[in-house]
């Protein structure tokens, strides 16, 4: 076994329910490296569309493969029926992402159970979920809020992306399928922003232990991505990242921050970016800095 194999973290991304499966499909299409993908659903037919190498139909006895009927309690019981299979899938993992769209039956009900299993196994567990549009049924939003609350209790860190925020970044002529695809893209960026920190080569290296320090038992998190070029590219990119229009959180008062800068930057560029974040987060914030070869900035901020 090589040193690289010995030191690499085993990361699993689990998409739960229809929206979670769609998000995983996008990540598979984007060829995110160093990650294993799993699709979980109560709907047997929907699972046939999932591109994850590993798929699991949960609650087979309970739902007969026909889905959760938009009832979170059914999704929850389905996951509980399949606890042993979930444990097998997550065996040996160092980090598990649980992603879903909150408000329906399977994702809302099953995701907290899936996350709870991971956390009980001692795995660093991160939830990345979307919240429904306000124009959707009131029941769907109330289910989502309940699911988010339960999920937060069962993860180390939770990133919540309100679908309503998509309205701030899309054109009025954007179709519903296009908007939902954008939501999948945001979920993918949130996950990839963290996994790239661990898996990709860097000038100033960040590793799994750094991510673990920032994300273990930290609650709600903020993750932003920015891109810029020109004389002040690092500062401009970091300003974009901390003011992400897709999130309800801010980095003010953050206890821990990871700044990961990618691209050709000078020492002064790095200093300007780090100083800007330190001023926003506060002098007590623990800031971990990394520099990569690509062209994005990722900031993760658990409060």
Segment roles from a protein language model:
Residues 1-301:
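Tubulin/FtsZ superfamily GTPase core signature
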